[in-house]
Amino acid sequence: MIKLLFMGTPQFSATVLKGLLDNPAYEILGVVTQPDRAVGRKKDIKVTPVKQLALEHGISIYQPEKLSGSQELIEIMGLGADGIITAAFGQFLPTLLLDSVSFAINVHASLLPKYRGGAPIHYAIMNGDKEAGVTIMEMIKEMDAGDMVAKASTPILETDNVGTLFEKLAIIGRDLLLDSLPAYLSGELKPIPQDHSQATFSPNISPEQEKLDWTMSNQEVFSHIRGMNPWPVAHTFLEGQRLKIYEAQLAEGEGLPGQVIVKTKKSLVIATGQGALSLIVVQPAGKPKMSIIDFLNGIGRKLEVGDIIGR
């Protein structure tokens, strides 16, 4: 039985961890995940999906704010793991830790060397890519730059958003890891170096990126909205108040960027730099998420054809 240390945080990571837990070839000695966070207006404490799964299986949990130089690092290195598996962990691993194990493998949600970094799925959708994927790679000190063990891809559908693609890629990543790890550990599967000249990066989404630019084409704005749903969520402005936009559909029509060109009891169509978008699900400031019909029956009632949003 191969003894592993698992490191990860979101549901993507938990799906990979569950696959390892269900496989008798591996023993998880401990998991390292991000600290619990206070979320929402009530500041409720939320544990990570990886921590929740570890609690259910009675696995030792470590949650350092920063792994490097921490007491947890000393404890983790004392576990005697053969190797490390990471998936969307969110921190660099100290060289001391990498050198203490026989192997360290990362499950990364992109087709490397494209989209190294923390938000590959967001960028794949926002950039209008036709496919996304997962790469199993060796871990080195440089971010997502290690040799590649295996790759798998899947089409990005127009119905996909970050949430749906996360779910698909988590399953692909889990299965790809479990399929490739035995051959990798036996030496049968030889890792392939990345072409570093082709590397692109996907840094964490900034607040500025959340704001929609109505001068872009309708396809670009459509991709941007999907690439922010369900988090951090794209937004525009209506009378100086933030209006989050969760879902929209491509539509025909022309007008000034951000201009209301169609308004009925059931639809609101906004012009873009090329074409238009019909808004489907929105969230006004201080209100819950709602259908466009409910929005038009409330705050959106005063909107008229010719009005411009986003200012």
UniProtKB/Swiss-Prot annotation:
Domain of life per record: Bacteria
SUPFAM superfamilies per record: FMT C-terminal domain-like, Formyltransferase
InterPro entries, sorted: Fmt (IPR005794), Formyl_trans_C (IPR005793), Formyl_trans_C_sf (IPR037022), Formyl_transf_N (IPR002376), Formyl_transf_N_sf (IPR036477), Formyl_transferase-like_C_sf (IPR011034), GART_AS (IPR001555), Met-tRNA-FMT_C (IPR044135)
GO molecular function: methionyl-tRNA formyltransferase activity
GO CC, alphabetical: cytosol
Record keywords, A-Z: Protein biosynthesis, Transferase
EC number: 2.1.2.9
Pfam families: Formyl_trans_C (PF02911), Formyl_trans_N (PF00551)
Annotated signal peptide: none
HAMAP family reported for this sequence: Formyl_trans (MF_00182)
Function (record text): Attaches a formyl group to the free amino group of methionyl-tRNA(fMet). The formyl group appears to play a dual role in the initiator identity of N-formylmethionyl-tRNA by promoting its recognition by IF2 and preventing the misappropriation of this tRNA by the elongation apparatus.
Family: Belongs to the Fmt family.
Protein name stated in the entry: Methionyl-tRNA formyltransferase
Gene: fmt
